[in-house]
Amino acid sequence: MSKAMALRRLMKEYKELTENGPDGITAGPSNEDDFFTWDCLIQGPDGTPFEGGLYPATLKFPSDYPLGPPTLKFECEFFHPNVYKDGTVCISILHAPGDDPNMYESSSERWSPVQSVEKILLSVMSMLAEPNDESGANIDACKMWREDREEYCRVVRRLARKTLGL
């Protein structure tokens, strides 16, 4: 797939997101000269310790998008079992097709060209509400999520306030 085809697809997805985007999510190209890097703002889901937080993130698309998945990285301090310490999100929908060596994911959960930016961002919001501690990216967050949920929620709420400058 050519970079021009990827660009057309990204422009179409951006138009759909601006016209019909889900609540709690804003996303679009970082600048009009580069449609392959998007700035996102994800609102913490209600009823979770992330509630009230506004989380900036960056989506980076490969030149063969949608054949290859993008990467998503939070650009603020973030504590979650499925987010690496550098902010990179680790969820099935962002994993390239193929076999999962750890046997945690079925191929139907992984990236395919029918996925979209909207589906990715909705999956991230779902991940915030329901972490997968079986295939953790942040071992400390996994351990705290399993063993001391109250402390985990306290840490996440503190970081949520920090996203608001409080």
Swiss-Prot record:
GO BP terms in the entry: ERAD pathway; inner nuclear membrane-associated protein degradation pathway; protein polyubiquitination; ubiquitin-dependent protein catabolic process
Cross-link Glycyl cysteine thioester (Cys-Gly) (interchain with G-Cter in ubiquitin) placement: C90
Keywords: ATP-binding, Nucleotide-binding, Thioester bond, Transferase, Ubl conjugation, Ubl conjugation pathway
Family stated for the protein in its record: Belongs to the ubiquitin-conjugating enzyme family.
Annotated pathway: Protein modification; protein ubiquitination
GO MF annotation list: ATP binding; ubiquitin conjugating enzyme activity
EC category: transferase
SUPFAM superfamilies noted in UniProt: UBC-like (SSF54495)
Reactions it catalyzes: S-ubiquitinyl-[E1 ubiquitin-activating enzyme]-L-cysteine + [E2 ubiquitin-conjugating enzyme]-L-cysteine = [E1 ubiquitin-activating enzyme]-L-cysteine + S-ubiquitinyl-[E2 ubiquitin-conjugating enzyme]-L-cysteine
Source organism phylogeny: Eukaryota, Fungi, Dikarya, Ascomycota, Taphrinomycotina
Keyword check for Transmembrane helix: no
EC number(s) given by UniProt: 2.3.2.23
Name of the protein in its database record: Ubiquitin-conjugating enzyme E2-18 kDa
InterPro entries with a match to the protein in the record: Ub_conjugating_enzyme, UBQ-conjugat_E2_core, UBQ-conjugating_AS, UBQ-conjugating_enzyme/RWD
Organism: Schizosaccharomyces pombe (strain 972 / ATCC 24843)
